[in-house]
Curated annotation (Swiss-Prot):
Catalyzes the NADPH-dependent reduction of L-glutamate 5-phosphate into L-glutamate 5-semialdehyde and phosphate. The product spontaneously undergoes cyclization to form 1-pyrroline-5-carboxylate. Belongs to the gamma-glutamyl phosphate reductase family. It is an enzyme of class 1 (oxidoreductase). This is Gamma-glutamyl phosphate reductase. It comes from Burkholderia cenocepacia (strain HI2424). The gene is proA. It catalyses: L-glutamate 5-semialdehyde + phosphate + NADP(+) = L-glutamyl 5-phosphate + NADPH + H(+). GO terms for molecular function: glutamate-5-semialdehyde dehydrogenase activity; NADP binding. SUPFAM superfamilies: ALDH-like. It is found in: Cytoplasm.
Length: 423
């Protein structure tokens, strides 16, 4: 297979399909989503059979249990796909909305209309559910998409792509609006991220090595985040019960997510009250504690251990594991300085009962999501009321934070006149 020619053809077809998608009615898009949902229900066994072949090959390669779990399409996973499709269909269609409409002294009206981005390339690892999630959001937002999943999920993705194509055709929409790259060749990714004439934006969903490669090689703009080094700062005016709940949930709810707390900052004035019960809670949940000298003194005195001395590298590390770095700081200024220096601009939280300090934290912490008295785990499209998300961005341009339907659109100015000319 000539990868360059193959990818160029996918891009050309996607660009052509994107024009039809931009003018597609809400009813047609919802009909396509419903048709795909019904097709998954109908062909559930065939999908599981295709997935079983992918899983068998992954086991032969010796891939670990966590990877196999992400790859596997269980009945529950298929039901979640179906529910997700119907949920996206139920969301308000942002395309064509005109907002900020204002009358000008010249007599014209000026507003902004929400429109699709065009063609979106999605690059992800071996999670077949992303094929459906990404296709649904791109379809509802009026975009065409090229999906490049992990090589270990080729058969699963091909089977899902067939059903997506059926759904598009049943709704009178172009099948090329959702295309799945049918090769495991890594050169396909290299071509996709440089096809500026056909692809408007890339959304990568994967590990740090994938994102770093794309940052270095992509010519197409990206919506992405590299790390999720999330912090919780417990102020000396915090409610202790709230602090314990937030710190527990932010770290132990799920270890392997990008919105999990990796560094805990504790004001020196509350460290003696907070750290002993919190340290025991983490110890009972087998969380490794990497601590500075001040935190060690408090925790050791309370009989909490074992403790590991924190290093400079720890402040830069996204563990994605039951490991937590802890630092005692002088107060709010030091906490904000630490977060803005070491953080990844993803999600950070403060626990405090002081309104002025909370507002300062919200204003001054340079992150996509900033929270007061709430767990960092809430940084999620569903929890934010977006209905669904295609990913999280910690960049500052275009989309920032959880990216839902509106994040896959842009605004263009529209002018309504009555024959006016500029004086």
């Amino acid at each position: 297979m000539d990868i360059d020619q193959y990818m160029t053809d996918l891009g050309r077809r996607a660009r052509h399909a994107s024009r039809a998608m931009a003018r597609a009615s809400t009813a047609a898009k919802n009909a396509a989503l419903d048709a795909v949902a019904r097709a998954i229900e109908r062909d559930a066994q065939a999908l599981k059979d295709a997935n079983a072949r992918d899983v068998a090959r992954a086991r032969e390669k010796g891939l670990d249990a966590a990877f196999i779990d992400r790859l596997t399409l269980s009945d529950k996973a298929l039901n979640t796909m179906v529910e997700g499709l119907r949920q996206v269909a139920s969301l308000a269609d942002p395309i064509g909305e005109i907002g900020n409409l204002k009358f000008r002294p010249s007599g014209i009206q000026v507003g902004q209309m929400r429109v699709p981005l065009g063609v979106i390339g999605i690059i992800y690892e071996s999670r077949p559910n992303v094929t459906i999630d990404a296709a649904a959001l791109c379809l509802k937002s009026g975009n065409a998409t090229i999906l490049r999943g992990g090589s270990e999920a080729l058969e699963s993705n091909a089977a899902l792509a067939k059903l997506i194509g059926e759904g598009l055709e049943a709704a009178g929409l172009p099948q090329d609006a959702v295309q799945v790259v049918a090769t495991a060749d890594r050169a396909a990714v290299g071509k996709l991220i440089t096809m500026t004439e056909y692809v408007d934006v890339i959304v990568p969903r994967g590990g740090k090595s994938l994102i770093e490669r794309l940052i270095n090689e992509a010519r197409v703009p990206m919506i992405k985040h590299l790390d999720g080094i999330c912090h919780v700062y417990v102020d000396d005016r915090a409610d202790l019960a709230k602090a314990l709940t937030v710190c527990d949930n932010a770290k132990t709810h799920r270890y392997g997510t990008c919105n999990t707390m990796e560094t805990l900052l504790v004001a020196s004035g509350i460290a003696a009250k907070l750290l002993p019960p919190l340290g025991k809670l983490y110890r009972d949940k087998q969380v490794e504690l990497r601590v500075d000298a001040a935190a060690r003194a408090v925790l050791a005195d309370a009989g909490v251990g074992p403790l590991v001395d924190v290093t400079e590298e720890d402040w830069h590390t996204e563990y994605l594991a039951p490991v937590l770095a802890i630092k005692v700081v002088d107060g709010l200024d030091a906490a904000i300085e630490h977060i803005n220096h070491y953080g990844s601009h993803h999600t950070d939280a403060i626990v405090t009962e002081d309104h002025d300090r909370a507002m300062r934290f919200l204003r001054e912490v340079d992150s996509a999501s900033v929270m007061v008295n709430a767990s960092t785990r809430f940084a999620d499209g569903f929890e934010f009321g977006l209905g669904a998300e295609i990913g999280i961005s910690n960049d500052k341009l275009h989309a920032r934070g959880p990216v839902g339907l509106e994040g896959l659109t842009s605004l263009k100015y529209v002018v309504l006149g009555h024959g006016e000319g500029r004086q």
